[in-house]
């Protein structure tokens, strides 16, 4: 039996640059480099003998490889309790992207399944994502994977790299 052509692996400090590049290619002008470098900021503070903050977010990160070529990535965050009226409790997908030439090969579905599995492991019941309101293609992909829109459009919720603000929608999927 052959091995799977699409595999997932953890993101480490040494391949974080690849995840950052994938994000810039798949969703241009949305993520700053600081967003990704913050994923490993606590590790670098400990290495420099500085005191890490006591409040640490729990992130789950994965890289998707197609025939050993990095083609996609996922950054998800555990939200153990509701922060405000615009948030939910569960696993928030902060970034899920696959290079255009590798879409429709179930790579995104594998990354989403990883987030759903983490949701169950953490005893949570919701996977949710904020999307730009104008991104109908991504919205339809999430809806096809069992997500539904929650509430109305949130004005000026997403801030891009250039400082421009976009309206957002919240999509969620309930995990039993």
UniProtKB/Swiss-Prot annotation:
<dbReference type="InterPro" id="IPR016181">
    <property type="entry name" value="Acyl_CoA_acyltransferase"/>
</dbReference>
<comment type="subunit">
    <text>Component of the N-terminal acetyltransferase A (NatA) complex, which is composed of ARD1, NAT1 and NAT5.</text>
</comment>
<dbReference type="GO" id="GO:0120518">
    <property type="term" value="F:protein N-terminal-methionine acetyltransferase activity"/>
</dbReference>
<dbReference type="GO" id="GO:0004596">
    <property type="term" value="F:protein-N-terminal amino-acid acetyltransferase activity"/>
</dbReference>
<dbReference type="Pfam" id="PF00583">
    <property type="entry name" value="Acetyltransf_1"/>
</dbReference>
<comment type="function">
    <text>N-alpha-acetyltransferase that acetylates the N-terminus of proteins that retain their initiating methionine. Has a broad substrate specificity: able to acetylate the initiator methionine of most peptides. Non-essential component of the NatA N-terminal acetyltransferase.</text>
</comment>
<dbReference type="InterPro" id="IPR000182">
    <property type="entry name" value="GNAT_dom"/>
</dbReference>
<keyword id="KW-0012">Acyltransferase</keyword>
<dbReference type="GO" id="GO:0007064">
    <property type="term" value="P:mitotic sister chromatid cohesion"/>
</dbReference>
<dbReference type="GO" id="GO:0031415">
    <property type="term" value="C:NatA complex"/>
</dbReference>
<keyword id="KW-0963">Cytoplasm</keyword>
<comment type="similarity">
    <text>Belongs to the acetyltransferase family.</text>
</comment>
<protein>
    <recommendedName>
        <fullName>N-alpha-acetyltransferase NAT5</fullName>
        <ecNumber>2.3.1.258</ecNumber>
    </recommendedName>
</protein>
<feature type="domain" description="N-acetyltransferase">
    <location>
        <begin position="14"/>
        <end position="176"/>
    </location>
</feature>
<dbReference type="InterPro" id="IPR051556">
    <property type="entry name" value="N-term/lysine_N-AcTrnsfr"/>
</dbReference>
<keyword id="KW-0808">Transferase</keyword>
